[in-house]
């Protein structure tokens, strides 16, 4: 592999050290290596902000692992940044000097504002949805809050609170008591209060979280079959569960890994304070953060205004998809959606996911015609899809699995991006659009009227169409039968 196309970003965080190695390919990045080690550097800071020898040794040990991988990458294509703990430590110089010797490249201690800016860039390059956003990143010793529109930040704040420092301060007795949570939340709200007005002034349409705490919440919710949106009610529910467990070493929540458990209660308390103080309705997980911001900064790639469209284009190119046919199916599905939207009340994000499924529905053909829907579902489940959340990927895979043949109703109910009923409705529209665009020519798509009354669909074709299209009639009869097996009434006239 040509080493000039390789880039590395290393983030010396207060809780974990991370390394990301990517390859630039056709204007996008392909992840080759991700290494993360829990170093808990912030736990080695004493009251005088002196970093202990043990904490420094843990850090250097980790960097020796990273150094081996960096040998293959040109130095101008490596960026190493250090954040909150090394901003605070009075003896940071000692740690950094040895770190630079181990890695063989400069280590830059960045300001809180620069960290916030890079986090925002990482989110802007990798996360779909509305472009007016609030980004929250809870680190080990600092929390970054950024508002912005598109690629541009409108306000940036880095606050002195993090999941490691809050663990040492409010849960040092390892006791998960209500009082400990109350104290941790109260002080976190006090820290937030001075910046809350400016954040609210700039406003946001979506809120995304870009930290281990948010990642852990996402894993818990996926494991428990909840939808992926983080809300205050869900956070309070998890707090009560933690309090019931009593002690940190006994903390057991389905979906919470042992590795994340130690700093989970402290991160949870900070997140509850942020939700409460800023009146956040819901939050989803970001696709990337600081390390992605560093990489995209080195590559000088512009932020694509529509990340999901870029992702779909890249995948269509890679799997040699007939884009004319994909657009034909999408146009027809959108037409059907408009005809039933008053009856079915389908939200804009559900529409976007349906159209994404249309764009990808034929990728399975690149493997084999036989079982193409299975291949398509497998590919979507396992491909990196910037702009789509894990739950949205699961929904897309489920729709592609059910694009034709008998319907697997349980799979539509197991995804958690949209309610089961909505998944069923999207599936029905996708199947009909694929069926009626099957001749692969715009002039052969009939004029179709679609009406919905609850779950009953009535499909009206031009008067003599069925008589002149015996194969088409057979396919429609078969589809009608398949839909009836899962109690989806389809009346064709």
Curated annotation (Swiss-Prot):
<dbReference type="Pfam" id="PF02541">
    <property type="entry name" value="Ppx-GppA"/>
</dbReference>
<dbReference type="InterPro" id="IPR043129">
    <property type="entry name" value="ATPase_NBD"/>
</dbReference>
<dbReference type="Pfam" id="PF21447">
    <property type="entry name" value="Ppx-GppA_III"/>
</dbReference>
<dbReference type="InterPro" id="IPR050273">
    <property type="entry name" value="GppA/Ppx_hydrolase"/>
</dbReference>
<comment type="pathway">
    <text>Purine metabolism; ppGpp biosynthesis; ppGpp from GTP: step 2/2.</text>
</comment>
<dbReference type="GO" id="GO:0015974">
    <property type="term" value="P:guanosine pentaphosphate catabolic process"/>
</dbReference>
<protein>
    <recommendedName>
        <fullName>Guanosine-5'-triphosphate,3'-diphosphate pyrophosphatase</fullName>
        <ecNumber>3.6.1.40</ecNumber>
    </recommendedName>
</protein>
<comment type="function">
    <text>Catalyzes the conversion of pppGpp to ppGpp. Guanosine pentaphosphate (pppGpp) is a cytoplasmic signaling molecule which together with ppGpp controls the 'stringent response', an adaptive process that allows bacteria to respond to amino acid starvation, resulting in the coordinated regulation of numerous cellular activities.</text>
</comment>
<dbReference type="GO" id="GO:0015949">
    <property type="term" value="P:nucleobase-containing small molecule interconversion"/>
</dbReference>
<comment type="similarity">
    <text>Belongs to the GppA/Ppx family. GppA subfamily.</text>
</comment>
<keyword id="KW-0378">Hydrolase</keyword>
<dbReference type="InterPro" id="IPR023709">
    <property type="entry name" value="Guo-5TP_3DP_PyrP"/>
</dbReference>
<dbReference type="GO" id="GO:0008894">
    <property type="term" value="F:guanosine-5'-triphosphate,3'-diphosphate diphosphatase activity"/>
</dbReference>
<dbReference type="GO" id="GO:0015970">
    <property type="term" value="P:guanosine tetraphosphate biosynthetic process"/>
</dbReference>
<dbReference type="InterPro" id="IPR030673">
    <property type="entry name" value="PyroPPase_GppA_Ppx"/>
</dbReference>
<dbReference type="InterPro" id="IPR048950">
    <property type="entry name" value="Ppx_GppA_C"/>
</dbReference>
<dbReference type="InterPro" id="IPR003695">
    <property type="entry name" value="Ppx_GppA_N"/>
</dbReference>
């Amino acid at each position: 592999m040509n080493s000039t196309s390789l880039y590395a970003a290393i983030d010396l965080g207060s809780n974990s050290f991370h390394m990301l190695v990517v390859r630039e390919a056709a204007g996008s990045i392909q992840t080759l290596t991700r290494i993360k080690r829990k170093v808990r550097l912030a736990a080695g800071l004493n009251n005088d902000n002196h970093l202990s020898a043990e904490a420094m040794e843990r850090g250097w040990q980790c960097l020796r692992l990273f150094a081996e991988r960096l040998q293959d990458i040109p130095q101008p294509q490596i960026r190493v940044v250090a954040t909150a703990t090394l901003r605070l430590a009075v003896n940071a110089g000692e740690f950094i000097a040895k770190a630079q010797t181990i890695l063989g490249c400069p280590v830059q201690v960045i300001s809180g504002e620069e960290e916030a800016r890079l986090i925002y860039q990482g989110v802007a390059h990798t996360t779909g949805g509305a472009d007016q956003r609030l980004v929250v990143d809870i680190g080990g010793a600092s929390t970054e809050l950024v508002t912005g529109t598109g690629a541009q930040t409108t306000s940036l704040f880095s606050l002195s609170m993090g999941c490691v420092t809050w663990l040492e301060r409010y849960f040092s007795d390892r006791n998960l008591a209500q009082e400990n949570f109350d104290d941790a939340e109260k002080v976190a709200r006090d820290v937030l209060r001075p910046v809350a007005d400016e954040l609210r002034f700039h406003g946001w349409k979506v809120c995304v979280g870009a930290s281990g705490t948010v990642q852990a919440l996402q894993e818990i919710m996926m494991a428990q079959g909840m939808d992926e949106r983080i809300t205050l009610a869900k956070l309070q529910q998890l707090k009560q569960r933690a309090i019931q467990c009593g002690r940190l070493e006994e903390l057991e929540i389905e979906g919470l890994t042992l590795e994340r458990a130690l700093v989970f209660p402290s991160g949870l308390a900070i997140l509850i304070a942020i939700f409460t103080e800023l009146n956040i309705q819901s939050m989803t997980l970001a696709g990337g953060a600081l390390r992605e911001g560093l990489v995209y900064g080195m590559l000088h790639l512009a932020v694509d205004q529509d990340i999901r469209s870029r992702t779909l284009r890249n995948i269509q190119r890679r799997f040699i998809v007939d884009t004319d046919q994909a657009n034909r199916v999408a146009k027809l599905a959108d037409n059907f959606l408009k005809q039933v939207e008053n009856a079915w009340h389908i939200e804009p994000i559900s529409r976007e996911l349906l159209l994404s499924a249309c764009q990808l529905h034929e990728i399975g053909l690149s493997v084999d015609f036989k079982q193409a829907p299975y291949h398509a579902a497998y590919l979507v489940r396992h491909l990196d899809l910037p702009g789509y959340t894990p739950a949205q990927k699961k929904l897309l895979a489920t729709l592609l699995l059910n694009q034709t043949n008998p319907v697997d109703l349980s799979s539509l109910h197991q995804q958690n991006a949209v309610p089961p009923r909505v998944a069923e409705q999207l599936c029905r529209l996708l199947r009909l659009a694929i069926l009626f665009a099957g001749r692969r020519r715009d002039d052969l798509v009939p004029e179709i009227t679609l009406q919905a009354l609850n779950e009953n669909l009535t499909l009206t074709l031009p008067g003599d169409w069925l008589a002149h299209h015996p194969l088409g009639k057979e396919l429609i009869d078969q589809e009608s039968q398949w839909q009836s097996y899962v109690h989806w009434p389809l009346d064709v006239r």
